[in-house]
Amino acid sequence: MTIAITGATGQLGRLVVAQLRAKAPSKPLVALVRSPAKAAVLGIPAREADYARPETLVGALAGIATLLLISSSEVGQRAIQHRNVIQAAKQAGVKRIVYTSLLHADTSPLSLAPEHRETESMLKAAGIPFTLLRNGWYTENYTGSVAGAVAGGAFIGSAGEGRISSATRADYAEAAAVVLTSAGHDGKTYELAGDEAYTLTDLAAEISRQSGKSIPYKNLPEADYAATLAGFGLPVGLAQAIAGWDVSASKGALFDDSRQLSKLIGRPTTPLATTVTAALG
């Protein structure tokens, strides 16, 4: 029963492939990617499958029993692209779809949520057994800024004292691998988040502790934070989106205390301190 992974060369996808190879070495795997040549490093067969080119999808999904649909990286195009994949999966006879959605997608104020809600609705209407992995925030979304914070003397954001229950990509990848290789998940929705909730003030304190430098958290108004990010060279639209996500975090959008992720993977999620250590190198 072959498992296919979309976006298999991406930051999450490659970790899922590694987990699957470790957990179920005899399980047939297929990487679905835009450029099969770039997937050679994964060590599994690869097929061309471009979300935006429906003509590539049905053939790519031939003979696939279980599909991991990793959400598209193209925000604003996700719903259309996901529809292409779901329709192709139905046509190809895929038996099961596992989808990486967003934490509390049905109620989340995050600007990312509507496309995930729409995709979830498509899956429910498709008639294919499915599982929703509602992934919370990646800790790396914040620790990617650690080096810059140390260099600049402050960690900046707009999340206020919002509590963030993030987990690492590796944690979410392991959860996906568990669901893909075990039974009893059809029709289930998992709200996945880290065990440890923290504020950006807490994150700044941890950076200070590990770096030996005083790195305070500086909370900025949304517009000021967006302007600062744009000043660092980010596209204006992306800068505004990131600032908006932080504001949503200040309202609780990134918090969850159900510990469904650690229950699913059978271990605690990766501590914030561990990810900060990795970021400091």
What are these regions (language model features)?
Residues 2-37, 42, 52-64, 73-83, ...:
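Oxidoreductase cofactor-interface core, primarily capturing Rossmann-like NAD(P)-dependent enzymes
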Residues 38, 56, 66, 260, ...:
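Residue-level recognition of oxygen-bearing side chains
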Residues 45:
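Acyl-donor (CoA/ACP) binding surface of acyl/acetyltransferases
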Residues 49:
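Cofactor-binding loops of NAD(P)H-dependent oxidoreductases
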Residues 68-70:
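Periplasmic-binding protein-like
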Residues 223-281:
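A hydrophobic C-terminal alpha-helical subdomain
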